[in-house]
Amino acid sequence: MHSKPETIANVSVKEYSFSKKQIQGVVKASQFRWTFIWSFHKGLLTVNPPLGRALIEDALLRFLLKKDYELEAGNEYKFTISAKF
């Protein structure tokens, strides 16, 4: 039986600002690295650079929607993506 492909994404929260209503951070998966801004009051996620963004954007958004109230600046988090890249 084959195991499902997966990749571990590592999220580092750099800033969590209630006044700006946003979270800024870095997410790394495989050889890729992106910065992100999650404007939680607008439901808007910005991920840069665009290279490989399609690989991470939906999974990162699901993670942030599920965990945003638990996240703290300066902490590291992990989540699993059901794809290998």
Where do the PLM segments sit?
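Short intrinsically disordered terminal tails
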Residues: 1-6, 82-85
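Intrinsically disordered, low-complexity regulatory segments enriched in Ser/Thr/Pro
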Residues: 33-51
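Mixed-charge, Lys/Arg-enriched low-complexity segments
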Residues: 48-85
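Non-membrane alpha-helical secondary structure
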Residues: 5, 15, 19-21, 48, ...
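Generic structural motif
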Residues: 9-15, 45-47, 71
